[in-house]
């Protein structure tokens, strides 16, 4: 029983100590700007001044129009990449994700290549780039 009581008393003292020192100290109340300047560790003159500029409706509309133009140009560029003609397929070829060991013919997909793993024991046709 004495060991249990000693353990509980130690735990209680530790919790009181932890509770007392975990709270931040109360802040000093500053009376005026002079005490603020003398007590502050950061000098306010070190930071550049901030200027606030009001935006009018025209500037907002221009920025929206520019954003829409950028979006449409990106879509057109991606469409141009997709619309590229592909080479005609040869009859004896290996489908994507099928085995393509050295006696096998080339991959059917022009964007795919034969990729081997485990010291060339397991080979398969895989598409490496999506933008092909």
UniProtKB/Swiss-Prot annotation:
Gene that this sequence comes from: ASIP
Top-level lineage group: Eukaryota
Composition skew (Basic and acidic residues), residue ranges: 63-79
InterPro entries, A to Z: Agouti, Agouti_dom, Agouti_dom_sf
Molecular-function annotations in GO: melanocortin receptor binding; neuropeptide hormone activity
Protein name (record): Agouti-signaling protein
Any one GO cellular component localisation term in the record: extracellular space
Domains: entry comment: The presence of a 'disulfide through disulfide knot' structurally defines this protein as a knottin.
PANTHER family hit by this protein: AGOUTI RELATED, AGOUTI-SIGNALING PROTEIN
Segments forming domain Agouti: 93-132
């Amino acid at each position: 029983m004495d060991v249990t009581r000693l353990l509980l008393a130690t735990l209680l003292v530790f919790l009181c100590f932890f509770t007392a020192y975990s709270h931040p100290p109360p802040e000093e109340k500053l009376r005026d700007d002079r005490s603020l300047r003398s007590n502050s560790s950061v000098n306010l003159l070190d930071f550049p001044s901030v200027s606030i500029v009001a935006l009018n409706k025209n500037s907002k509309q221009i920025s929206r129009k520019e954003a829409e133009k950028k979006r449409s140009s990106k879509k057109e560029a991606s469409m141009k990449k997709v619309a590229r003609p592909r080479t005609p397929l040869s009859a004896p070829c290996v489908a994507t994700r099928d085995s393509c060991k050295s006696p096998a013919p080339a991959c059917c997909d022009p964007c795919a290549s034969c990729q081997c793993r485990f010291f060339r024991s397991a080979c398969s046709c895989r598409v490496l780039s999506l933008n092909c």
